[in-house]
Amino acid sequence: MTFLIAVVMLGLIIFVHELGHFLTAKLFKMPVSEFSIGMGPQVFSVDTKKTTYSFRAIPIGGYVNIEGMEVGSEVENGFSSKPAYQRFIVLFAGVFMNFLMAFILLFVTAKISGRIEYDTNAIIGGLVKGGANEQILKVDDKILELDGKKINIWTDISKVTKELQDKEEITALVERNGKEENLTLKLTKDEENNRVVLGISPKYKKIDLSTTESLDFAKNSFNSILIDTVKGFFTIFSGKVSLKEVSGPVGIFKVVGEVSKFGWISIASLCVVLSINIGVLNLLPIPALDGGRIIFVLLELVGIKVNKKWEKKLHKGGMILLLFFILMISVNDVWKLFN
């Protein structure tokens, strides 16, 4: 199931990206010889007078073959023969569609799931199944003290347990059904986050959002993720983060497996993050990527002529570097899975 979810998610993101290129190319009457979903050997195809629509064996990936994309090629009404502004729109359309998809997903999830508002009172709303205190505490218990330290609001619990993280057991004063009770609770170590926990969660309520509120949520969330993504790429290329910490396609499968345990909203959220990441990646000014091609179009728009032979060589070199980069990350992902 994890494999299927990952394939569908990545396939959808790439399909939407290529659809942007395809629709704008058709809008400007550029000949499109093929629109492919997937990579590798062709499994099924539908031929029309102008375009072949194909499905290929490897379900991840896809491409749009717009005639005239090769630097220096001369095709009637081809990509290279069109005005610079039209070429810019076609190149940017894939990224735009990724961003639009992310925004729509954020809006839909906000509209359906609403906003979760947590109760600030130190009243237990849930217990971790199989947790050390599942049989000791009960939902609706109000925690008054932990090891003699007063608890006024929910956030006080984590502050106090942090101070007591060297202990294995602590005393607790709780209010249950209007009566106060003294209990002995066990602290469980959360190694991943370097803390101790009681295995409890607060009460919360779902608040439905209006269309305007959902749009506002989508806008703010999109901007936040976009800024974080740009900062992330800057950190990678500035050498502040080791490539060993970067995940590629293989690593994404592992993340999907973990996220899918928490339901469709978490899967949709991951899809949003990946869609924005792929959009930003394609905007990077690297030859062979959309961003690299856009740079050359912008130079043309401001009157700077670039030697076509050099441009062609740069795009080929950029593609080789990109494939090498993806290979390195994928090998690292596989290494991490086995270690």
From Swiss-Prot:
TM spans (from-to): 88-110, 262-284, 318-335
Name the Gene Ontology molecular function terms of this record: metal ion binding; metalloendopeptidase activity
Active site residues of this protein: E18
Using the record, list the residue span of the signal peptide; answer none if the entry has no such feature: none
Q: Does the keyword Nucleus apply?
A: no
Required cofactor names: Zn(2+)
Query: Which EC number(s) does the record attach to this protein?
Result: 3.4.24.-
- Ranges for domain PDZ: 96-179
Q: Which residues hold Zn(2+)?
A: H17, H21
Note whether Protease occurs among the keywords.
yes
Q: Name one Pfam family in it.
A: Peptidase_M50
Q: Name one GO biological process term.
A: proteolysis
Q: Name one GO cellular component term.
A: plasma membrane
Name of the protein described by the UniProt record: Putative zinc metalloprotease FN1322
| Organism of this sequence | Fusobacterium nucleatum subsp. nucleatum (strain ATCC 25586 / DSM 15643 / BCRC 10681 / CIP 101130 / JCM 8532 / KCTC 2640 / LMG 13131 / VPI 4355)
